[in-house]
């Protein structure tokens, strides 16, 4: 496989259905097109090594090829590896034990889980690759509930499946459905390495992009990934994503809601949860209609605008329902109130609540000056971090060595970008963002 090449995958937000999804109600998640992980796969400067460089978490580690030989060349261990390569529904504890010595030096939690995810997928997907450096850059805030770990897992899975010859070729022009299925399967394994029991939602959104509808199985309480309903032709919806930096415990928030549902007010909570599920169903229906309503005549434009206003109204309603069950936070309400005061659009919390992030779908009649004023006040007065992006958009994608080598100036800039430890989001977007540059990403 020719080097260097790049892979990328987006983050995600929950549009509708936070908390109600726990009680088997439908929910909708979507990719965040401009918040992404980028992975550069290049030749390592140190011979006979595999290197992982992830400056966002201050992590760089090299493993010797000899570290892997005990797994790949020993007859008994290679049989254990072969079993793990076939077991795409869960982690092989035999392989986990074989990887323990390679992780022994890593005590910091972030570093350990990043390395565990990396090594598990590496030995399963491209165990004979050598002299390779994996360099990660992300424009996603880590730990904000925006699917940063899934974005990383998908980027790694795509790169390693490509290196291992499981998908595509040097002349890869399009990722097939089977390619994406393989990537999603292994990214889910990567998520298991990091989180233990992930839902499968984050990696699916990061792989396929756009949006999906999901709900728990009422019989066993798990999310059946085979029942995901993907919205492929998703309308680009402009939004401001705001990260409050307010820490929160998803576990505590879910437990607090559970007390309301099962102990204190079950009859009150039932219609609220039902309404949240209905927001998800109607929201998906509206977005589907928006994606199909593309005419330029007066009637089509009017219909499109009416649908968009309905979507904004549903966002407002869903946030109100979340407030009613006690999962908002004064810091989130500041954003909601400011967006209402400035008539920017409709704001709701996204994710577990209690802090974290909000999304603001923007009205169509506002100016860039109004948007900038909104962002500036949030940043200057409250030290929040804002991201102007679109809801939905490209999922995982790959920039082959063939395409990267076509422009040596761009190639040089890419390497400079990854070597610079203090690269800004704007610098990354200007050079790499799919759809924002002329780079021929394959998706």
Swiss-Prot record:
Keyword Lipid biosynthesis appears in the UniProt entry: yes
Query: Where would you find this protein in the cell?
Result: Cytoplasm, Cytosol
Which UniProt keywords are given for this protein, alphabetically ordered?
ATP-binding, Cytoplasm, Kinase, Lipid biosynthesis, Lipid metabolism, Magnesium, Metal-binding, Nucleotide-binding, Steroid biosynthesis, Steroid metabolism, Sterol biosynthesis, Sterol metabolism, Transferase
Which cofactor(s) are needed, names only? Mg(2+)
Q: What class of enzyme is it?
A: transferase
What EC number(s) would the UniProt record show?
2.7.1.36
What is an annotated GO biological process for this record, any one? ergosterol biosynthetic process
* Reactions performed catalytically: (R)-mevalonate + ATP = (R)-5-phosphomevalonate + ADP + H(+)
Residues that bind Mg(2+): 149, 191
Superkingdom of this entry's organism? Eukaryota
Q: Which GO terms describe its molecular function?
A: ATP binding; magnesium ion binding; mevalonate kinase activity
Matching entries from SUPFAM superfamilies are given as: GHMP Kinase, C-terminal domain (SSF55060), Ribosomal protein S5 domain 2-like (SSF54211)
Q: Which InterPro entries match?
A: GHMP_kinase_C_sf, GHMP_kinase_N_dom, GHMP_knse_ATP-bd_CS, Mev_gal_kin, Ribosomal_Su5_D2-typ_SF, Ribsml_uS5_D2-typ_fold_subgr
Question: For ATP, which residues are the binding ones?
Answer: 12, 138, 143-149
Q: What are the GO cellular component annotations?
A: cytoplasm; cytosol; nucleus
List of catalytic residues: 202 (proton acceptor)
- Tell me the route in metabolism or biology where this protein functions: Isoprenoid biosynthesis; isopentenyl diphosphate biosynthesis via mevalonate pathway; isopentenyl diphosphate from (R)-mevalonate: step 1/3
| Pfam families, per the entry | GHMP_kinases_N (PF00288)
Quote the record's miscellaneous comment. Answer: Present with 3300 molecules/cell in log phase SD medium.
What does this protein do, in the record's words? Mevalonate kinase; part of the second module of ergosterol biosynthesis pathway that includes the middle steps of the pathway. ERG12 converts mevalonate into 5-phosphomevalonate. The second module is carried out in the vacuole and involves the formation of farnesyl diphosphate, which is also an important intermediate in the biosynthesis of ubiquinone, dolichol, heme and prenylated proteins. Activity by the mevalonate kinase ERG12 first converts mevalonate into 5-phosphomevalonate. 5-phosphomevalonate is then further converted to 5-diphosphomevalonate by the phosphomevalonate kinase ERG8.
Q: Which family does it belong to?
A: Belongs to the GHMP kinase family. Mevalonate kinase subfamily.
What do we know about how this protein assembles, alone or with others? Answer: Homodimer.
Q: Can you name this protein?
A: Mevalonate kinase
Organism listed in the record: Saccharomyces cerevisiae (strain ATCC 204508 / S288c) (Baker's yeast)
Starting at the broadest rank, the lineage of the source organism is:
Eukaryota, Fungi, Dikarya, Ascomycota, Saccharomycotina
State which gene encodes it. ERG12
């Amino acid at each position: 496989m020719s080097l260097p090449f790049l892979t990328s995958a987006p983050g995600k937000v929950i549009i509708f259905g936070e908390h109600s999804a726990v009680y088997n109600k439908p929910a909708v998640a979507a990719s965040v097109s401009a918040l992404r992980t980028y992975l550069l796969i290049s030749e390592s400067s140190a011979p006979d090594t595999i290197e992982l460089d992830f400056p966002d978490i201050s992590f760089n580690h090299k493993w010797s090829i000899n570290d892997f030989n005990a797994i790949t060349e020993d007859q008994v261990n290679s049989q254990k590896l072969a079993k793990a390569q076939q077991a795409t529904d869960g982690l092989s504890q035999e392989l986990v034990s074989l990887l323990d010595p390679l992780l022994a030096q890593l005590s910091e939690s972030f570093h350990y889980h990043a390395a565990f995810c990396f090594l598990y997928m590496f030995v399963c997907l491209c165990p004979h690759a050598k002299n390779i450096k994996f360099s990660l850059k992300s424009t996603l805030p880590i730990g904000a509930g925006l699917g940063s770990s899934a974005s990383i897992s998908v980027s790694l899975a795509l790169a390693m499946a490509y290196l291992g010859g499981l998908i595509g070729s040097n002349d890869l022009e399009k990722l097939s459905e089977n390619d994406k299925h393989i990537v999603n399967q292994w990214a889910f394994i990567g998520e298991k390495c990091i989180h233990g029991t992930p839902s499968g939602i984050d990696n699916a959104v990061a792989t396929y992009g756009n949006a999906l509808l999901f709900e728990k199985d009422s019989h066993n309480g798990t999310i059946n990934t085979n029942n995901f309903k993907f919205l492929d032709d998703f309308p680009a919806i402009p939004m401001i994503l705001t990260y409050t930096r307010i820490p929160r415990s998803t576990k505590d928030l879910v437990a607090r809601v559970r007390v309301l549902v099962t102990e204190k007010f079950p009859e009150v909570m039932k219609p609220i949860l039902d309404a949240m599920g209905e927001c998800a169903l109607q929201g998906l229906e509206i977005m589907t209609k928006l994606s199909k309503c593309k005419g330029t005549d007066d009637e089509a434009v009017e219909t499109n605008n009416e649908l968009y206003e309905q979507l904004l109204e549903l966002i407002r309603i869903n946030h109100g329902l979340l407030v009613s069950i006690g999962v908002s936070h004064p810091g989130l309400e500041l954003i909601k109130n400011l967006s209402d005061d400035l008539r920017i659009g409709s704001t709701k919390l996204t994710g577990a609540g209690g802090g974290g992030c909000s999304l603001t779908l923007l009205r169509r009649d506002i100016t860039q000056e109004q948007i900038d004023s909104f962002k500036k006040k949030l940043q200057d007065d409250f030290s929040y971090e804002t991201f102007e992006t679109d809801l939905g958009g490209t999922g995982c994608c790959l920039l082959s060595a063939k395409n990267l080598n076509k422009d040596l100036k761009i190639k040089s800039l890419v390497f400079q970008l990854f070597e610079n430890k203090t690269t800004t989001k704007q610098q990354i977007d200007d050079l790499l963002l799919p759809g924002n540059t002329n780079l021929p990403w394959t998706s």
